[in-house]
Amino acid sequence: DENAGTFRATVDLRLSWFDGRLAKSGPIVGVPPDTYRDAAAEARMKEIWVPPVVLSNQQGEAAFSSYGLRVYPDGNVELLHRVTADFAVDVDVARFPFDRQQLFADVAVRGVPISQVTLQFDQSDIDFSRPSVAANLPGWSIGLVDLRSSPISSWYNTSEARVTASLTVARQPGLVVASIFIPLLASLLIPLLAIWLNRMEDGMFQVDAFELVNIIIGGLFAVIALNFTVYSTYVVLADGDNTVNRLFALNYLALATALFVNIFFGRFNVLARAFSPYVQEQAYLVIMWAVPVLVAITAAAFTPSARIFSPVS
């Protein structure tokens, strides 16, 4: 839910460490590990030392949680924790709808400084960290998982270990472009047509300014309705600088420009009265070409380019 800044995921967390107190005496070659699951694993975890690791960006209680524990005869311990929960995420929509988001789970040690407990990962952990083959996120293409160590500051100038596992996803822009960007760009034609539909002959405008102003006011209500619809569906777009906000601002600016031009030239004939009808006709001709060119260049500059990766097979 990008509007709420959360996502729901099932995360498999694997932790491995060595505890010499759990090593068995005598020959250990071929001796299988002690395996515990669910309630038995939780009971055994209360009897041994387990690193105080939490998913720090988890929101609320987990919808599902299950443990698996293996204690090897040489003292190595492997803990598997599968959890389904909501996680907080910072959504960046600056490049909407060609944006990428990082869906991350923060694995952090709480209450113990990094000098005593640290989190490390190697190639086997990187190979283990991948999206499920059954993973499906409607409207998004699923990329790869990245692991990054990022300790967090704690009390008394100490740090606590943290590893961030992030899944890169890219928005599929097809539906968004059709439902938002095509109407936004099409609405820019309304103020341009309100300028282009008029013309001067013998120093007089051929279309009454009142009719063109009606077109502009109708376009204003259309943009307001589109604005309300978009922000109701994508609340996250209402804040910050993004392409949608820029195009809405350009629409309002173009409508205001068209309204000013029609009142200034068509209603009051300011230049014709101040100078001559010829001066007004030439000035209006320049505006007929300058405004569409400026609007087109600005709209093109506001629209981000697409950089979409292929989904994971």
Annotate the PLM regions.
Residues 299-313:
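Juxtamembrane boundary at the C-terminal end of a transmembrane helix
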Residues 118, 156-157, 228, 299-303:
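C-terminal ends of transmembrane alpha-helices
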Residues 17, 47-49, 90, 140, ...:
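Generic detector of bulky aromatic hydrophobic side chains
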